[in-house]
Amino acid sequence: MTTIRLTNTKTRRKEAFTPIDPANVRLYVCGPTVYDRAHLGNGRPVVVFDVLFRLLRHVYGPDHVTYVRNFTDVDDKINAAAQARKAAGDPRSLEELIRARTDETIRWYHEDMDALGALRPTHEPRATEWIGAMIAMIEDLVARGHAYEREGHVLFRVRSYRDYGALSGRSVDDMIAGARVEVAPFKEDPMDFVLWKPSDDELPGWESPWGRGRPGWHIECSAMSYELLGASFDIHAGGIDLQFPHHENEIAQSCCAHPEGGFANVWMHNEMLLVNGKKMSKSLGNFFTIHDLRKDRGIPGEVIRMVLLGTHYSKPMDWTAEKAAQAKATLWKWRKLTADVEPAASPDAAVLAALADDLNTPAAITRLHSIAAQEDGALLKASASLLGLLEDDLRGWTLPPVTGTGSGVMEVSGSATAIVGSVQYRETIERLLDERKQARMGKDFKRSDAIRDLLVGAGVIIKDTPAGAEWDLGADFDPARLGEPE
């Protein structure tokens, strides 16, 4: 069996991964707060840990991996979005507006992540469906002396957990000195964090032993992971921005509520995403949602995925238009090579070894280039699948890669039905090439050059051979530019 080695944030070492139960490998990844469309940075952990999910499924079997990624659908940002709609005149109740907003945002999220080629997790729990489990966990923490109630709030007593700060490498006193915490008069200690907070009549709330209220952010993941994965599970992952305070707080409350377990054995964090070397910011004009890139800029989801995997997850990733263009051209070539080809029975050993070495996706992609250079379409397709690439779903390609010759032979990436509508382009291109041939035979070189310029300008690649002209559609092919030559 392939040995997987992963960098464990908790130990700060790359370690051989040994699951608690090889028959049920368990993975938890923190999901989105569903108040708006997912931005490009939100896509990075989804794609990175989708590769981990695929790798675990390959090594241990698809039926032996459980992957949980939650939706936070109770949050002040969600409330604010619903209140803004209400203020704008929407007649629905705030509760109805919140549900409509979260349902809509989850649908958007699924559309975007499906386009990026991410497999759906085994479970996608919504926080609001697990309020009872959260209340029960908070009650356990209070009973064990790790939490207390003040003014309708329930707070976790941070100094009751002696290992607090171990994940992020911070001491409690240093954290206080750094003023990275919310100080409230009802706290025993500035570091104590909220498990439960009161709700007024206008805000979402649930009845509890401490009055009507709603959960704090951190307790959600602890309760849902316990209910779906148990007190101990294999891997907990997420973005580096969640390491503190979210993941630190998860560890504290989970280990104190369930001391019989160890919570997560391995912690993994992907680094941040930049755009053109800078942090994404609306004021800088470099803030993109995945929907923006897909729909407004016409970048296929598979291309976005390829760019995200081009940098190791442990390093900051810089998105640029040049990288996207390069990835698009590469995938276009690979899709033509794998058109209507059945994948090999097994992926390439070097690709698998690269991914098993702490998800080294750049090394895996380098190896895919070598396989493509050998024109082994079957092996390329099987190996790329481990990275979620070159699958039959075309995922946003506006036109499938097509090649042709004077005989009208065509090749298509993906399913055969993807060719629908492109026959007209073949007929137009071959008619123009025939007109070009006739013009050259009649020594009307001005017209033959004009036809060639028209085709090239539309993104058609022409190669003249002794047997006649061969053509190919480039990645920038635009049928709208196939007019009549001047």
Curated annotation (Swiss-Prot):
UniProt-recorded Gene Ontology molecular function terms: ATP binding; cysteine-tRNA ligase activity; zinc ion binding
Pfam family for this entry, one: tRNA-synt_1e
Alphabetic keyword roster: Aminoacyl-tRNA synthetase, ATP-binding, Cytoplasm, Ligase, Metal-binding, Nucleotide-binding, Protein biosynthesis, Zinc
Positions occupied by motif 'KMSKS' region: 279-283
Reaction(s) catalysed (UniProt annotation): tRNA(Cys) + L-cysteine + ATP = L-cysteinyl-tRNA(Cys) + AMP + diphosphate
Positions in coiled-coil regions: none
Subcellular localization(s) per the UniProt record: Cytoplasm
Binding site for ATP: 282
Entry binding sites for Zn(2+): 30, 221, 246, 250
UniProt keyword Cytoplasm, yes or no: yes
EC number: 6.1.1.16
CDD domains: CysRS_core
Keyword Signal among record annotations: no
Family assignment from sequence similarity: Belongs to the class-I aminoacyl-tRNA synthetase family.
Subunit structure: Monomer.
Protein name: Cysteine--tRNA ligase
Gene that encodes it: cysS
